[in-house]
Design a protein with these regions (language model features):
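Short, solvent-exposed secondary-structure boundary/capping segments
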Residues: 46-57
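Glycine- and charge-enriched low-complexity intrinsically disordered segments
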Residues: 60-69
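Short, solvent-exposed loop/turn positions at domain surfaces
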Residues: 17-18
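Short beta-strand-centered aromatic/proline hotspots
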Residues: 36-45
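Short, well-ordered loop/turn sites that connect or cap secondary structure elements
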Residues: 23-24
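Short, basic/aromatic beta-hairpin or loop at an interaction surface
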Residues: 1-14
C-alpha cells in the first residue's frame, strides 16, 4: 500500500489523501467523497508515494426523482 495524494491541477489543493494498492492509471475514474474524478496525470510516483492530479467528471445520468408514497 502506498500513500496517494489527489490534487486539483489548477489550484494544487489536496482533495484527499489515502492509501491505495497501487497508483491509479491515467484516465481511470476515482471517487473522492461523493464526487467522481478522472485521473489526468501522475507526478512523482515512486514505490513509496504518488501525487495524482484529477479533474471532476460530470454525472452522466440523473436519477428520476419520485415523490414519497
Amino acid at each position: 500500500m502506498i500513500p496517494v495524494q489527489y490534487r486539483d491541477p489548477q489550484t494544487e489543493e489536496i482533495l484527499e489523501r489515502r492509501y491505495e494498492e497501487g497508483a491509479p492509471a491515467i484516465g481511470a475514474r476515482v471517487r473522492i467523497g461523493f464526487d467522481e474524478y478522472r485521473v489526468l496525470y501522475r507526478w512523482r510516483c515512486v514505490p513509496t508515494s504518488c501525487i495524482v492530479y484529477v479533474h471532476g467528471v460530470a454525472r452522466e445520468g440523473r436519477r428520476e426523482v419520485r415523490p414519497a408514497a
